[in-house]
């Protein structure tokens, strides 16, 4: 048997008869680690499917992408999702991998999909983005002005004599 494997097995055993390790000595059988079995998400999907069947959802075909706009300006983008809907219960279910993207990444492709309220929110977002850019540029400008008053340190020169 491999010596390293034997040493690992001895270290994992609770009963140790050596006098050098009095902490682990004791009677009884060693405790064994319980292997935890994690539930797979497949069980959750099955429960969800049965609940949706009770609501009598119907699949909607030919949906290429779904975009969900968040308040912070980001978009949750689903490419080729599976969509099920139940109009009487006003319920829609989306299946697929959603990616969180910035609105600027999707702008050219989604302009024709936006409604009037989304266009208004897009304008507000563009204005806030421009204001943020201006404020950052203004902060950098103030930073540069403050740095003009501070002379650069050059090796061999003494600026304290100029102050006096």
Curated annotation (Swiss-Prot):
One of its GO terms (biological process) is protein transport. Component of the nascent polypeptide-associated complex (NAC), a dynamic component of the ribosomal exit tunnel, protecting the emerging polypeptides from interaction with other cytoplasmic proteins to ensure appropriate nascent protein targeting. The NAC complex also promotes mitochondrial protein import by enhancing productive ribosome interactions with the outer mitochondrial membrane and blocks the inappropriate interaction of ribosomes translating non-secretory nascent polypeptides with translocation sites in the membrane of the endoplasmic reticulum. It comes from the Eukaryota. Residues 145-164 have a biased composition (Acidic residues). It is found in: Cytoplasm; Nucleus. Pfam families: NAC. Residues 28-39 have a biased composition (Basic residues). GO terms for cellular component: nascent polypeptide-associated complex; nucleus. It comes from Aspergillus clavatus (strain ATCC 1007 / CBS 513.65 / DSM 816 / NCTC 3887 / NRRL 1 / QM 1276 / 107). InterPro entries: BTF3, NAC_A/B_dom_sf, Nas_poly-pep-assoc_cplx_dom. This is Nascent polypeptide-associated complex subunit beta. Keywords: Cytoplasm, Nucleus, Protein transport, Repressor, Transcription, Transcription regulation, Transport. PANTHER family: TRANSCRIPTION FACTOR BTF3 FAMILY MEMBER. Part of the nascent polypeptide-associated complex (NAC), consisting of egd2 and egd1. NAC associates with ribosomes via egd1. Residues 1-45, 130-164 are annotated as: Disordered. Residues 42-107 form the NAC-A/B domain. The keyword Transcription applies. SMART domains: NAC (SM01407). Belongs to the NAC-beta family. The keyword Nucleotide-binding does not apply. The gene is egd1. Its main location: cytoplasm.
